[in-house]
């Protein structure tokens, strides 16, 4: 007589599959510690924790701790001392954690990061921003300009305004269209 339910044995332990899982996790951990910034990638120490690495570089691990927000404390106004009781408002103490960092290395890393940011900003400032609209939006802008000119209120009431753009949205879209390369191409043709 055959069984209706198949009997299952103990699941087999496959060393190869478990080793693959372990190696994959290990690779993912390594990927997390890598940074796109070359100076951070160069000074990163695999043996240290991320918090220790960042502290040694002189960078803030938690920006909220680095630049604390001033807490509004209620001042005691017109408080009259009672006999035998003194009122003392404690000042908050600064919490210092961790070991000393290498000051020269930290200064070097920070100066390199600042220099890299300046170079990126200069490169961005040199480039003109390119505006693009989708092909359908370009057609719509050309149609609206031909039909209504610069009257954004009329564009809003037009039956082809399927997305129900407001006059401000039309103004922005038309400005973007005029700054785009497609508009310049259409004007020259």
UniProtKB/Swiss-Prot annotation:
- Subcellular location field: Nucleus, Nucleolus
Bias-annotated ranges (Basic residues): 1-33
Disordered: annotated segments: 1-34
Main location group:
nucleus
Q: Which Cys pairs does UniProt list as disulfide-bonded? A: none
Give the protein family: Belongs to the NOP16 family.
**Protein known as:** Nucleolar protein 16
Q: Which organism is it from?
A: Caenorhabditis elegans
């Amino acid at each position: 007589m055959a069984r209706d339910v198949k009997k299952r044995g103990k699941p087999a332990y496959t060393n190869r599959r478990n080793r693959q899982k372990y190696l994959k996790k290990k690779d993912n951990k390594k990927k997390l510690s890598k940074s796109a910034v070359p100076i951070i990638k160069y000074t990163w120490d695999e043996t240290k924790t991320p918090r220790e690495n960042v502290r040694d570089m002189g960078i803030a691990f938690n920006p909220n701790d680095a630049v604390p927000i001033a807490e509004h404390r209620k001042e005691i106004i017109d408080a009259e001392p009672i006999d035998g009781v003194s009122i003392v408002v404690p000042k908050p103490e600064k919490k210092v954690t961790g070991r000393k960092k290498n000051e020269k290395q930290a200064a070097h890393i920070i100066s390199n990061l600042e220099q890299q940011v300046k170079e990126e900003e200069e490169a961005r400032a040199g480039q003109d921003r390119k505006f693009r609209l989708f092909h359908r939006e370009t057609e719509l802008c050309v149609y609206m300009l031909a039909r209504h000119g610069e009257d954004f209120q009329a564009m809003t009431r037009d039956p082809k305004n399927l997305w129900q753009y407001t006059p401000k949205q039309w103004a922005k879209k038309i400005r973007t269209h005029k700054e785009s390369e497609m508009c310049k191409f259409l004007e020259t043709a």
